[in-house]
């Protein structure tokens, strides 16, 4: 066998081993999530990772009575599970007629990879399934350093972004509103 064929053979073998390792870790993480009572919403395979989107339910509360909404994404690479899971936090209010979006938490290493869109789309799916017509939220003052990116992100998902003209508010710099059409 030529040297080039040997190199390609070894490279193919390494790729297969990485894919197998990612798949095994993905299966293990799915089992862990299900054993904790989480609902696995989807598993997405990308070139470099598997993404397990899940919803965290609190113990002994039926889904239709659950006020809190926690949606996370476990990122599995060939090195294992990648750090803290990106997480969306929201809650139902006004007798389950509105959702209030609290936060989308994400490590810098996950920004601009589509994970925030996946989380927000999952929340929008919940709103549509539950016939929720409105989602509200605030843009926190801690996000002022990347406000342009946030405005683009929320407008891309059909949210109205209302930036505050009053700089005296120490907690927020804007409001978010999504109305189901």
Where are these predicted regions, by residue range?
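Glycine-rich phosphate-binding loop
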Residues: 114
């Amino acid at each position: 066998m030529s040297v080039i064929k040997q190199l390609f053979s070894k490279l193919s073998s390494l790729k297969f081993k990485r894919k197998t390792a990612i798949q095994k870790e993905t299966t293990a993480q799915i089992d862990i999530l299900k054993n904790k009572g989480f609902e696995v919403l989807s598993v997405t395979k990308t070139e470099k990772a598997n993404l397990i989107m899940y919803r965290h339910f609190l113990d002994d509360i039926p889904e239709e009575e659950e006020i809190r909404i926690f949606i996370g994404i476990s990122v599995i690479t060939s090195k294992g599970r990648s750090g803290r899971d990106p997480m969306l936090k929201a809650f139902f209010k006004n007798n389950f007629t509105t959702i209030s979006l609290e936060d989308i938490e994400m490590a810098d290493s996950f920004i601009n990879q589509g994970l925030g869109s996946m989380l927000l789309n999952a929340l929008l799916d919940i709103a549509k399934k539950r016939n929720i017509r409105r989602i509200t939220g605030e843009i926190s003052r801690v996000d002022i350093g990347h406000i342009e990116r946030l405005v683009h992100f929320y407008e891309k998902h059909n949210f109205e972004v209302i930036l505050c003209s009053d700089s005296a508010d120490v907690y927020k710099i804007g409001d978010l509103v999504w109305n189901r059409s």
